[in-house]
């Protein structure tokens, strides 16, 4: 590289490391590709530009005529829909079952019913990775969570646990008969579960969603798996006390609509506290291996939550105070500690309810706040270290 001009001090190691961040490098590469290579008269430069743009797309950046734009990256897709998330899903449901017992009402929400893997991630992701069907199979695949008798419902499909069929199928027929609906039910075995099919003009999502939701409220099934299109805004089930978000949406409206599903008063449990879960996959060996964690931070940028000190805070700090400052690499290194703490916290719903201070006076006006931490080791305040008056009775 070039030497620094005379009189310019050597930069610190942290400054050099910051200059190698993806944001800085993308800005430099974008200008070099668009203003240098693409405007060159050399065919070799044009070929190099296309090669560079192709490689940047792998990192989730598309170079356009007007500048860089974010796009889906293969590694980001792998992180979002990794099968390792299903191990965490089973751990979460098992912990919640131990705490809530027969009162558990869990809902698992995904983006799609099935997601087909693209050619770029072929052989890495399953054909239906990240979809509702894959999550449903994961719940059935564990002896503990299989006892929840899960049901999957989307806009086109209804699946029922094989252990549940004998009990729930007659209830389906009874429900339709009591409402004089034109539905003739049938089922097809699909291994560990059955696909419910219906014929007649009333076999529509609006009716079978109402029917299955009613069974869920009663506890015939204690776990629903579905898509955010069906289990999002407009769907209501007051008894939900566990919500697992496997979606990739980060917009304010979608996030608040989804989390709002569990914010319903339950007449059977006046002291109800619902746990909303995010499952995050990290892989520090990849350049884009923290995409899922960064998406998690964007989600909580739109959400309020209670902190350990009872403050209602908007941002990822209400999930864990360490997330406010710690870099993704630090989260990855201490992942097991965070996981253990979250599972322990989930078991203590009484404390969570106390932290919210339900029924106590509060101000509904949001305020911005700056957290200042002293690092001088001389107590409060450290004013004498920044050129202000020293702490005394007079000052």
Question: What do the PLM-derived regions correspond to, one by one?
Answer:
Residues 209-217, 224-241, 254-265:
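SF2 helicase motor core recognition
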Residues 1-223:
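Conserved C-terminal RecA-like helicase domain
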Residues 330-395:
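The feature captures the C-terminal accessory region of ATP-dependent helicases
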Residues 109-110, 226-228, 245-247:
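Short His-Asn-centered micro-motif
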Residues 121-124, 166-168, 238-241, 258-260, ...:
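Short, glycine/charged-enriched secondary-structure capping and boundary segments
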Residues 237-238, 250-256, 263-345, 357:
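A conserved SF2-helicase RecA2
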Residues 113-115, 157-159, 230-232, 248-251, ...:
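Conserved nucleotide-binding/hydrolysis micro-motifs of P-loop NTPases
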């Amino acid at each position: 590289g070039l030497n620094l001009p005379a009189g310019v001090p050597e930069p610190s190691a942290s400054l050099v490391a910051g200059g190698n961040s993806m944001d800085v490098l993308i800005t430099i590469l974008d200008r070099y590709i668009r203003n240098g290579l693409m405007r060159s008269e050399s065919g070799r430069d044009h070929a190099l530009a296309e090669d560079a743009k192709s490689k940047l797309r792998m990192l989730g950046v598309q170079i356009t005529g007007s500048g860089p734009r974010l796009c889906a990256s293969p590694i980001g897709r792998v992180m979002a829909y990794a099968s390792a998330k299903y191990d965490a899903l089973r751990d979460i449901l098992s912990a919640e079952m131990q705490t809530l017992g027969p009162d558990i009402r869990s809902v698992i929400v995904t983006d799609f019913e099935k997601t087909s893997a693209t050619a770029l991630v072929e052989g890495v992701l399953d054909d239906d990775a990240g979809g509702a069907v894959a999550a449903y199979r994961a719940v059935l695949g564990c002896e503990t969570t299989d006892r929840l008798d899960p049901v999957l419902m989307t806009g086109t499909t209804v699946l029922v646990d094989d252990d549940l069929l004998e009990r729930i199928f007659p209830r389906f027929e009874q429900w339709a008969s009591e409402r004089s609906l034109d539905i003739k039910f049938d089922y097809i075995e699909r291994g560990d579960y059955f696909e419910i099919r219906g014929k007649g003009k009333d076999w529509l999502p609006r009716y079978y969603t109402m029917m299955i939701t009613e069974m869920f409220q009663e506890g015939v099934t204690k776990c629903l798996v579905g898509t955010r299109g069906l289990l999002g805004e407009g769907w209501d089930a007051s008894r939900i006390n566990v919500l697992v978000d496997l979606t990739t949406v980060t917009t304010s409206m979608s996030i608040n609509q989804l989390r709002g599903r569990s914010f319903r008063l339950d007449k059977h449990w006046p002291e109800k506290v619902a746990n909303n879960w995010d499952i995050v996959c990290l892989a520090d060996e990849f350049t884009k291996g923290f995409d899922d964690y960064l998406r998690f931070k964007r989600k909580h940028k739109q959400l309020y939550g209670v902190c350990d000190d009872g403050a209602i805070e908007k941002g990822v700090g209400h999930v864990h105070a360490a997330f406010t400052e710690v870099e993704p690499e630090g989260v990855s290194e201490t992942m097991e500690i965070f996981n253990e703490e979250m599972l322990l916290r989930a078991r203590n719903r009484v404390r969570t309810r106390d932290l919210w201070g339900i029924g106590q006076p509060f101000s509904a006006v949001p305020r911005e706040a700056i957290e200042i931490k002293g690092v001088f080791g001389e107590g409060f305040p450290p004013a004498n270290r920044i050129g202000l008056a020293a702490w005394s009775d007079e000052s």
